[in-house]
Amino acid sequence: MTSAPIAQQRLLIDLQDIDSRLARLRHERKHLPVLGRIESVIERLKTNKRAAIQADAALSEAKTRVTRSEDEVGQVVRRAEALRERLHSGNSAARDLSAIQGEIDQLGQRQSALEEAQIAAMEALDSAREESERLKQEESDIRVAGRELTAKRDAEFARLDQEIDSLEKQRADLAGTVETALLSDYEAVRASTGGLGAVALRGRTVEGGAVEISPQELARIVAAPQDQVIHAEENDVIIVRMDI
């Protein structure tokens, strides 16, 4: 059973206060609201990237369709011009003139259909370009928002890290004044409970943690020697008497 002067035991309450504050600060650092917002920005950027890949593919396909439609129209126009030259050259036999004119008429119909398809392809190209540009602008906006949030996160980290560093130094100084055996006892309890090592007992009231003591246990504590380090029956937390 560990024993230590009551003054030494009371240092554990100050140490616990620092440890509790450190735990709160570390929890705050890990769960800053800005971190969730940054994650949302990252997801938006991923979604934008996927959409941009699809948009670029659609733009490339639209360009190919426009080029193909232009080539098809050009071929029909050149063929029709060649036939008109034959028709008006006077070198064709009379029996061929009707066939030439018929093919010219068919090419005219074909040209009209191809030109309509060309217009549709150009409209699709314009839409694909607009979507690609929209996604590029969206990406830029997302990155701007990301940089702003990152700057805010870094500022919050710097503030919290400064507080944590200051408290860690205070803790090191204070821990250095606690007897080795008592400090080891405290640290072991903290490790087993997940952070709570010591609580203060003032009269019949336990302060600083969820520790309940029965009347029988209270009587045992009151009767214990002053330098005896007392552990709660419930969870082994060190109970420091503040009124003796």
Regions of interest found by a model, annotated:
Residues 206-209, 231-235:
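Short cysteine-rich clusters marking metal-coordination/redox-active sites
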Residues 146-208:
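Coiled-coil termination/hinge junctions
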Residues 49, 72-112:
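Extended, amphipathic alpha-helical coiled-coil scaffold segments used for oligomerization/tethering
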Residues 1-5, 20-60, 86, 133-147:
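Short, charge-rich amphipathic alpha-helices with coiled-coil/heptad character
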Residues 125-160, 241-244:
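Non-transmembrane, heptad-repeat alpha-helical coiled-coil rod segments
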Residues 39-46, 70, 97-105, 124-125, ...:
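Short, charged, amphipathic alpha-helical segments
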Residues 54-66, 107-128, 174-175:
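Amphipathic alpha-helical coiled-coil segments
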Residues 68-80, 114-139, 184:
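Long amphipathic alpha-helical coiled-coil segments
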